[in-house]
Amino acid sequence: MTRVISVIQSKGGTGKTTLSVMLAEAIRKMGYAVAVADGDPQQSAIRWATKVKDFPFPIESVRSSSDFSGVVRRGNNPDFLIVDTPPGGLAFITESAEAADLVLLPTGVSPMDIDRTQVTLSWLMEMGIPTAVVLSNVDRRERLLDEVHAELEGDETAALAETVIPTRAATRRVFGTKPSSTKVWDSLAREVVAAFED
């Protein structure tokens, strides 16, 4: 049975597409079949895949969660379907959350990022959807990182991923290149897969 992972954040610029594609590749490298459903009207994941010859897994455009079954079928029933959602777009985000076995909620560490994340997190918790917060685009020297860790770890409504996605020029330049796993993405992939084994 295909497990659905929806990457959701109502705030833009949090790295949802990068997380979706790079996580898919890291999970694929673990030996699992993956597919990505691109629900963002900007179609960033689709555009990424079209720039790469022999992209390693299928990415398809979707407009609603009812399209997920077609992606799964055409992807030969992958082990994991990762859904890249748009910022805003409440109807699609809601459908994607309801269809998910796990929601990943990427966020930066600025006060505005955390405020928006807590609003989204409260909404997901009201829906009863298993959720993990992923700190993304983070400068490890940032003092806010420790504060955010303490604040989110104290929140028992969602898991906080141990893996932190750092700010790196290389991470910003992956768009349009063939995805390859790195220690950071491999670590996050192991956490995500382990969540389904518990």
Model-derived regions, located:
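P-loop/Walker-type NTP enzyme "switch/lid" segment
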Residues: 4-14, 21-95, 166-176
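Beta-strand-loop-alpha "switch" segments that mediate conformational coupling across diverse proteins
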Residues: 139, 149-178, 196
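Inter-motif core of Ras-like GTPase G domains
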Residues: 89-110
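Structural beta-sheet core signal
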Residues: 36, 83, 105, 133-135
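Conserved C-terminal guanine-recognition region of P-loop GTPase G domains, centered on the G4
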Residues: 114-136, 140
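C-terminal boundary of histidine-terminating zinc-finger modules
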Residues: 173-192
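Conserved nucleotide-binding/hydrolysis micro-motifs of P-loop NTPases
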Residues: 41-43, 111, 138-142, 169
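Short glycine-/polar-rich loops that comprise or flank the Walker A/P-loop
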Residues: 32, 99-101, 127-131, 159
